[in-house]
């Protein structure tokens, strides 16, 4: 029962995300491809990674990662930020253009959050939040906190 319910909710969020990505992906100069949109999501979740960290996470070559990153920089979705500890290294920073794009994608998540708060008691919402934090921080250690 739990597995089925979890999978249904997770799949619905994925479907909504994919729908929005493909709505935003256009065949014109400067638009994002689906792969670029997913790459930006990974960079966001890795929180200012280096190109090496990005490549390692996706299990792709450094040159392939560099190619993807350079395209995203050209399109204005990504910026390079020099490392404070090693001037030869830089971190990937998401641009304002990316956050404008993300606002369109996250509207569904906010709608679901509003529905949760309207449907359940404050106590239930707080318990659900606590459970989600435990799941994220303790039960999914391979992705850090």
Positions of the model-derived regions?
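N-terminal positioning helix adjacent to the helix-turn-helix/winged-helix DNA-binding module
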Residues: 2, 35-36, 97, 124
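Hydrophobic recognition helices of helix-based DNA-binding modules
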Residues: 13, 17-21, 65, 105, ...
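Charged, amphipathic alpha-helical coiled-coil/dimerization segments
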Residues: 71-127
């Amino acid at each position: 029962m739990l597995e089925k319910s979890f999978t249904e909710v997770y799949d619905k969020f994925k479907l909504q995300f994919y729908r929005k990505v493909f709505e935003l992906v256009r065949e014109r100069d400067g638009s994002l491809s689906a792969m670029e949109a997913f790459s930006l999501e990974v960079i966001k979740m890795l929180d200012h990674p280096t190109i090496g960290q990005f490549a390692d996470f996706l299990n792709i070559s450094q040159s392939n990662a560099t190619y993807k990153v350079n395209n995203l920089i050209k399109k204005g979705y990504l910026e390079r930020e020099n490392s404070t500890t090693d001037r030869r290294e830089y971190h990937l920073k998401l641009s304002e253009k990316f956050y404008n794009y993300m606002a369109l994608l996250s509207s569904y998540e906010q709608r679901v959050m509003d529905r949760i708060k309207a449907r359940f008691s404050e106590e239930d919402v707080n318990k659900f939040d606590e459970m989600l934090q435990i799941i994220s921080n303790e039960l999914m250690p391979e992705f850090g906190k």
